[in-house]
């Protein structure tokens, strides 16, 4: 479901570049909003169930590097992030990888609270240039931290989506800020898991 929604969303961006406000484009982008929350949720679930964190992380990092080429080619953006803008310079897979790293950090008993806070800030800076920016990394952290409490997981997920929508509203596009909130459509799908 997430791959189909993502494909519809990305094809819409490629066929109709920019922030088009026609109903077909908006509808396809709204459908696409379910993708990221599903990915966030399953990164956290994968972390819980994996037998080898190292292999899981390496596969995700490799996929992030490979998908960067496809992402920059598809959207006609420079290969090197931050050369034109700070937003959406690489795929969401980069943020997924760093979200996974935050889950591992969160489980560490060797790190003090202030050290974890510094790491979260650093990871947010590292993942800022990706699709869904650092919102994806902190959403994964909160989804993983509240595993076992679906309502709390989804509440925090939507808090972070709302933060992303606010950034869109003030810095990118007001209509597409509202589109981000359609991530809530993923909640019934995730509840059925």
Label each residue range with its predicted role.
Residues 1-193:
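Alpha-helical transmembrane segments and their immediate juxtamembrane cytosolic regions
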């Amino acid at each position: 479901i997430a791959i189909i929604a993502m494909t519809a969303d990305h094809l819409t961006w490629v066929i109709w570049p920019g922030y088009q406000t026609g109903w077909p484009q908006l509808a396809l982008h709204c459908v696409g909003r379910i993708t990221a929350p599903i990915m966030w949720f399953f990164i956290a679930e994968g972390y819980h169930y994996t037998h080898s964190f190292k292999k899981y992380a390496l596969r995700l990092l490799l996929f992030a590097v490979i998908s960067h080429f496809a992402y920059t080619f598809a959207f006609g953006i420079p290969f090197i992030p931050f050369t034109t803008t700070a937003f959406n310079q690489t795929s969401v897979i980069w943020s997924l990888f760093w979200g996974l790293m935050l889950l591992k950090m969160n489980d560490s008993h060797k790190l003090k609270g202030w050290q974890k806070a510094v790491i979260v800030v650093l990871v947010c800076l590292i993942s800022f240039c990706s699709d869904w920016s650092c919102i994806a990394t902190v959403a994964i952290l909160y989804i993983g931290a509240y595993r076992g409490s679906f309502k709390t997981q989804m509440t925090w997920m939507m808090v972070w989506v709302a933060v992303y929508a606010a950034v869109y509203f003030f810095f990118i596009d007001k209509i597409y800020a509202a589109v981000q909130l359609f991530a809530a459509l993923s909640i019934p799908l995730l509840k059925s898991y």
